[in-house]
């Protein structure tokens, strides 16, 4: 299990997400951005718009995705979840 923040995933806050894969982190971040946008959190609106627009810009989206996967791979395992 590893930890990444909303900010590490392109968002504006330091909410921590936990997961075993980069894909889990991305899904958790997407849910977080949707919830923040629904709640009217204007600080999260740019990141939410980027998330929604990824499918329209596949090359840029793949660059972002590879960056997240690289960052995730470089993170240490969480101490309290290490096996």
Where are these regions (language model features)?
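Metal-centered catalytic cores of metalloenzymes
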Residues: 1-83
């Amino acid at each position: 299990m590893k930890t990444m923040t909303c900010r590490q995933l392109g968002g504006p806050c330091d909410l921590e997400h936990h997961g075993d894969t980069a894909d889990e982190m991305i899904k958790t971040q997407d849910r977080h951005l949707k919830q923040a946008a629904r709640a009217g959190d204007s600080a999260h609106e740019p990141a939410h718009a980027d998330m929604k627009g990824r499918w329209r810009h596949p090359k840029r989206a793949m660059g972002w995705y590879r960056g997240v996967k690289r960052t995730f791979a470089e993170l240490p395992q969480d101490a309290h979840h290490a096996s």
